[in-house]
Amino acid sequence: MPPLLNALQLRLQHQFAEPALLQRAVTHRSFSADNNERLEFLGDSVLNLAISSLLYQRLSSMPEGDLSRVRANLVKEGTLHQIALRLQLPDLLRLGEGESKSGGKQRPSILADAVEALIGAVYLDAGYAAGEKVVHHLFEGVDINPHMRAAEKDAKTALQEWLQGRRMKLPQYEVVATTGAAHRQTFEVACAIAELQLQARGTGASRRAAEQTAATAMLELLKARHA
């Protein structure tokens, strides 16, 4: 294994049984068809579950809505970007020439996606317990306290709380299209609420941004329907 990847293992505190997973986790789609997008998808779910469990234990008296808001603050792009910098991911990312020249190695969305991909890679390599352990390690330096609930709600959190307040299932987000050059992509995401047979779409320069736009559009639909 290359020395830089071996050093990343040490920072993650996880030794990979399948080193190819680690290599894939730091490979952007602009570099290869064997890239980290599917790992990112998996890691997003592992991250949310691990953080949910952590908050449930640490903030035992906090109501559900506030827990959702704290979690949204913890797993947002800005937090994951800071974790990526601590892991020194800009030195490790494999990007296509165009993406690299356009500053992709410093782009917060790409770095945040790589953190999720690493979590997904650990999960595939050794299971959920190992993935949860790595998540807890990565968030050791992140402040987790009840005051985070006072932060402004983003659209996804607001939509989730609206549905939970009516005992409805959470919305499903799906990337339905990706357009543009690898270094300047636009993502289109569909947000669906099956119980209401509603769907809204949004676009953005990253999956996260597109999900927020789709959630905003869905909130507008709900507002119009329930006005």
Curated annotation (Swiss-Prot):
Q: What is its EC number?
A: 3.1.26.3
Task: Please tell me one Gene Ontology term that the record gives under cellular component.
Answer: cytoplasm
Q: Which InterPro entries match?
A: dsRBD_dom (IPR014720), RNase_III (IPR011907), RNase_III_dom (IPR000999), RNase_III_sf (IPR036389)
Q: Which gene encodes it?
A: rnc
Q: Assembly state and interactors?
A: Homodimer.
Describe its function. Answer: Digests double-stranded RNA. Involved in the processing of primary rRNA transcript to yield the immediate precursors to the large and small rRNAs (23S and 16S). Processes some mRNAs, and tRNAs when they are encoded in the rRNA operon. Processes pre-crRNA and tracrRNA of type II CRISPR loci if present in the organism.
State the name under which the record lists this protein.
Ribonuclease 3
Which PROSITE patterns did the record assign?
DS_RBD, RNASE_3_1, RNASE_3_2
The domain of life for this entry's organism is Bacteria
Q: Which reaction does it catalyse?
A: Endonucleolytic cleavage to 5'-phosphomonoester
Q: Name where it mostly resides.
A: cytoplasm
Q: What is the lineage of its organism?
A: Bacteria, Pseudomonadati, Pseudomonadota, Betaproteobacteria, Burkholderiales
